[in-house]
Amino acid sequence: MRFFVSCAKGLEYLLVDEVLALGAVGATATVAGVNVEGGLCDAQRLVLWSRLASRVLWPLAAFACADEDALYAGVAALPWVEHVLPGQTLAVDAHVSGEAITHARYAAQRVKDAVVDTLRDAGVVRPSVDVEHPDVRLNLSLRKGRATLSVDLGGRALHHRGWRQAPHAASLKEHLAAAVLLRAGWAKVYAEGGGLLDPMCGSGTLLIEGALMVADVAPGLSRYADPDAISHVSVAERPVLLPSRWRGFDVVAWEALVVDAQQRARRGLAELRPVLHGSDIDPRALGAAFANARAAGVQDAIEFVVAGIDVLPAVFEPHGVVVCNAPYDVRLAANPGLYRHLGDALRRVVPRWRAALVCGSSPLAFATGLRAGKKYQFFNGALECVLIVCDPVVPLAREAGGAQALSEGAQMVANRLRKNVQRLKKWRMRAGVECYRVYDADLPEYAAAIDVYQEVDGARRLFLHVQEYAAPASIPEGDVRRRRHELLAAVRAVFDVSVAQVALKTRQRGKGGSQYGCFAQRGEFFHVCEHGALLRVNLFDYLDTGLFLDHRPLRARMAREAVGKRFLNVFCYTGVASVEAAVAGAAATTSVDLSSTYLHWCTDNFALNGQGGVRHRLVQADALAWLEAERGQYDVIFCDPPTFSNSARADDFDVQRDHVRLLRAAVARLTPGGVLYFSNNFRRFRLDVDAVAAFAQCEEISPVTIDLDFSRNTRIHRTWLLWR
């Protein structure tokens, strides 16, 4: 069974790891959540044990939903007497996106009406509404004409732990605190004898979550504890209530999970070492922190001290982790000076410890003066935050002489890179572009194309793809090597990346089959995001990365036009255009390529986005021969052939020689009103306008398919729109 576990944006891949560790059969990350394969017991285990999830949603039904009548009918068709007992209370949460029904509250009301009317018609006492603590909480997701109705097995947002007795204005939500601790590797540090320090602990969220994590206490034990027992009974002994009274809830399995969790909590709390330290300048905040720690049952493991960051509490552990949720919104008056003082204090008191600091922005993180080995982004409510991890706080000198200064040539390249980064910044922020071209032989003597790839999971590392153009034979080899080294030095300095994060390739005229040859044996794939689709790329092992950045705006245009339609992608490569069309809502996609390597890659891209199955067909075939034999019709076709290719399994292909034949076959597959996008990057290509006019209307649209980052090289590709 597939069910959905939601989370805050930025935590998806941590949640995948947690879900799998808790026994799920499979898990696939998507935006703000994870699709999970498993049974009801697996879902209930997540309700009890997940430290990262927001909600666990068990599906009841999914159906087409064009309007409010279809919504009502789809919900009313369910056998509600099998789900809700007479007299129970009910709540409905709704999330709608781009639908005929645009108001979530109205959608929730229609769901509630359908449930109540169905039960009344069956002669059952109608449920009443309780939005805070219902017996059964339903969740409606309405997206792209499709409704999914689920039971919220947790009954409430799972970031609530049950121990927060005294909230504080600057509190970090508990599931985000758990994410910070996981990114910091706190559990491993604790196992090795280390400590935990929070110099701005506020109401103690990070420290309490840290204590419960290493004590192996399930979050659900306190969340669902009998409220009357919280103040005077140990967390491992409190009666635990059902999170949901949905009739399908497996009570026996839940009780067994609780018994096991209580046994683990008893052992963990008994062995918990007092190695957690917190300080804050506000005595009221510390009062709240101690009350919360007592409610969580970990007050004896945490030392709280009233102190500013200039006077950090003494720590006796030789190594450990500093965690901190520093002020960063307007209400809390964030300022770079505070961050600078924090960095100074950590360098002075715990220079060899690891630090994981939540900052409001990259500039505030930079103000600490600490060198971040890793950076992550996530949302604390509506606020976007940056988490930096510095290991250690004061790094050991890299070399005896420190970092080498850039040469004059490298400095020139670095200046141009910084200028380009700044020039592209507003456009990138507005367009949500994370992978882009930052340099393309701007300085002729440093002839290379440089692309930036932002990892979306794991450590969210930056990778640089440097494609060096082949130097003329008249340039001495010594000069070629020097300029290459200067270029790479500038790249590493500007983007603050290691050698391992830079892929260097020398671009030469391609030979048939070379696109399949390996350049390295690293096998290092990572994920990036474009237009809401997750994509698998590899910068090191192949000639190309798996993502042609120059076609970015064309892919967006085709995805918009393919909503609810049939999309065909010939010479599909890794299937990025097909995947983005599927994510946007294409009714069906067909992707054709001769390479099994690329089709496997395409399959992985579909799976990353929870797509696939019979609606999304992959075909291994010679594209031209397949088109001429195909009889299906398509609304949107993308044709991006190579300049030249040869294969033992297919005829040689030359785009200049064969394009009329190719386009005639592709246009023949268009539905009435359908469109064909034809693109190629052969610089000397000439479209045979007269021949094409015999079977299609044709318009060149190249300028609108070039984004700002490729504006220096507007001939990177040419694109035509064809229709009948």
UniProtKB/Swiss-Prot annotation:
Record keywords, A-Z: Cytoplasm, Methyltransferase, RNA-binding, rRNA processing, S-adenosyl-L-methionine, Transferase
Gene3D superfamilies, per database record: 3.30.2130.30, RNA methyltransferase domain (HRMD) like (3.30.750.80), Vaccinia Virus protein VP39 (3.40.50.150)
Location (main, coarse): cytoplasm
Pfam families for the chain: Methyltrans_SAM, RlmL_1st, THUMP, UPF0020
Stretches assigned to the THUMP domain: 42-153
EC numbers: 2.1.1.173, 2.1.1.264
CDD domains the record matches: AdoMet_MTases (cd02440), THUMP_AdoMetMT (cd11715)
Localization per record: Cytoplasm
InterPro entries: 23SrRNA_methyltr_KL (IPR017244), RlmKL-like_Mtase (IPR000241), RlmKL-like_Mtase_CS (IPR053943), RlmL_1st (IPR054170), SAM-dep_methyl-trfase (IPR019614), SAM-dependent_MTases_sf (IPR029063), THUMP_dom (IPR004114)
GO cellular component: cytoplasm
Annotated catalysed reactions: guanosine(2445) in 23S rRNA + S-adenosyl-L-methionine = N(2)-methylguanosine(2445) in 23S rRNA + S-adenosyl-L-homocysteine + H(+); guanosine(2069) in 23S rRNA + S-adenosyl-L-methionine = N(2)-methylguanosine(2069) in 23S rRNA + S-adenosyl-L-homocysteine + H(+)
GO molecular function: 23S rRNA (guanine(2445)-N(2))-methyltransferase activity; RNA binding; rRNA (guanine-N7-)-methyltransferase activity
Role of this protein: Specifically methylates the guanine in position 2445 (m2G2445) and the guanine in position 2069 (m7G2069) of 23S rRNA.
PANTHER family tied to this protein: RIBOSOMAL RNA LARGE SUBUNIT METHYLTRANSFERASE K/L (PTHR47313), RIBOSOMAL RNA LARGE SUBUNIT METHYLTRANSFERASE K_L (PTHR47313:SF1)
Family membership: Belongs to the methyltransferase superfamily. RlmKL family.
HAMAP family noted in UniProt: 23SrRNA_methyltr_KL
Protein name: Ribosomal RNA large subunit methyltransferase K/L
The organism of origin for this protein: Xylella fastidiosa (strain 9a5c)
